Amino acid sequence: MTRLPKLAVFDLDYTLWPFWVDTHVDPPFHKSSDGTVRDRRGQNIQLYPEVPEVLGRLQSLGVPVAAASRTSEIQGANQLLELFDLGKYFIQREIYPGSKVTHFERLHHKTGVPFSQMVFFDDENRNIIDVGRLGVTCIHIRDGMSLQTLTQGLETFAKAQAGL
């Protein structure tokens, strides 16, 4: 059987949704009567299309999920996770400005999962480099999170575990 990570960690901006929550949209957010999520100005807010399936797949595989975001819009990011009904997937959330290394040190401390047993999905190369130095398997996202990217990430993790 393919080895699975003990923790899958996701950035939020340009990984789960196609914007920066602290600059491109205007919190607070709400869910309209038609079920769409909107910002204060009424702008429609959406996830990348396959994000709910990605998180559901990890849940079905028994892989816990965490968030690691450097946004300064902490309340808005958490609000969006709840409005999109994604909060149920996340066992930990590290959402605050600063180095992603700090986010991962706290995730390690809170979960007990070794860095080598984590996989991390992020759109910013600097975060990939910094977190990769900890021994985390890092996957650089280019066009938002998708099932294909998840599959590639899990394969990369399994190969790293096998020493390939």
Curated annotation (Swiss-Prot):
Changing residue 100 to R: Abolishes enzymatic activity. Changing residue 122 to N: Abolishes enzymatic activity. Gene3D superfamilies: HAD superfamily/HAD-like. GO terms for molecular function: metal ion binding; protein tyrosine phosphatase activity. Mg(2+) binds at residues 11, 13, 123. It comes from the Eukaryota. Its cofactor is Mg(2+). Coiled coil: none annotated. Belongs to the HAD-like hydrolase superfamily. This is Magnesium-dependent phosphatase 1.
